[in-house]
Amino acid sequence: MLKNLLATKPVQDLTAAGESNDLRRTLGPAALTALGVGAVIGTGIFVLTGLAAANNAGPAIVLSFVIAGVGCAFAGLCYAEFAAMIPVSGSAYAYSYATLGEFIAWFIGWNLVLEYLFGAAGVAVGWSRYVVKLLEAFHINLPPALSNAPLDIAPGHGLVQTGAMLNLPAVLIIAVVTSILVAGVRQSSFVNSLIVAIKVAIVVLVIAFGAFYVSADNWRPFIPENSGEWGVYGWSGVLRAAGIVFFAYLGFDAVSTAAQEAKNPQRDVPIGILGSLVICTLLYVLMSGVLTGMLPYPRLNDAAPVAVALEAHPELLWLTIPVLIGAVAGLTSVMLVMMMAQSRIFNVSRWLAAAGVPRNASRMEDAGVLDRADGRLRRDHRRSVSAHTTRPACLDRHVDCFHHSLHWRAGAALRSA
């Protein structure tokens, strides 16, 4: 039994099994880079920037983003090297199966499933909140009973009833994203690239117009003096802020799950991973620099620091609605990439079994938790159908877990790495 648990699959067999699959190689470096940017840039650029600057790093938050970006780049290099050697879907699940054995692969595979599950479900809740705010800007009010979860997690009380019926916007966006993914990877990639272009354009718009209202006085001192407590300003604050804004980089590993659909995975996947990290780091640094320059950093201690910065300069209030649109677009692409990546984890266990893998822990469906139908390919579209249709079922619980899902997803990502 121990021998089976530690058994590995030769790289040649993994590659051969992947080549015999029905997935088409249609994604180039630009599409893969867009996948990475789509997965990484969500609300982190609009939320974490202000909180980390106000409470930890001050204007030096730009250094925190650079430090976090460099750390992610090292992890990205590992993913890039593995993706070049083992150009199949499955990401860390397939890599660990080739190197560490079936049991470790099974453990990492389910951690990836949890990462994408809680990530997409939590982001759907956040998407709902931004859509409600956007509708309110046009004087359209959605009843609270249809925009909140019937259950919430209260500290010290566990699950409590909220009196709401269901989070209708969250359910609808999951259904829409599922439909896009079932249509096919080419269509999904096109929609993702379009959404990424919209949200990046809005971020650049805020940076460009906000730069005219930057005051160098707000950047002095660049690294505020430490308050006497570790992590509150000073260099310790810069490092602590780097750990906080690390959450804003989660998702770049999703690029590796599309290796089996890359035209030239040995070249395109590394470009997609590292290219997306460079673009995201650049946008994060510029946005944080502009925000801390527009007003004193203590005033950014708000869950919506961009809105606070815009309100401090009435001439920029017209950017409020574009920022909401950018947040909605950002979260939409995050959901799309997360759900696409999870289907790849489900699908890889299916074709590994078809390639002759022993029936044991390496097949997630053999664990008795994942149904054998999950991961089945719809041959006319080369996409996983059952893995996508399980997502609305997961969301039927309607538990409002937006804040908790960030920590669950981060923990799963670190364990899988």
Where are the regions a protein language model picked out?
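Membrane-helix boundary/coupling elements in multi-pass transport proteins
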Residues: 74, 88, 111-129, 244, ...
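Helix-loop-helix junctions that connect adjacent transmembrane segments
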Residues: 13-24, 62, 139-170, 194-320, ...
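Hydrophobic alpha-helical segments of multi-pass membrane transport proteins
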Residues: 133, 202-206, 345-346, 394-417
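Extracellular loop-to-transmembrane helix junctions
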Residues: 24, 45-157, 165, 236, ...
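Membrane-interface "cap" regions at the ends of multi-pass membrane proteins
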Residues: 1-50, 54-59, 72-77, 86-89, ...
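Transmembrane helix-loop boundary segments of multi-pass membrane transporters
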Residues: 51-57, 61, 112, 123-130, ...
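Select transmembrane alpha-helical segments in multipass membrane proteins
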Residues: 25-36, 101-114, 169-173, 231-245, ...
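Loop-to-transmembrane helix boundary motifs in multi-pass membrane proteins
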Residues: 24, 29, 167-171, 263-284, ...
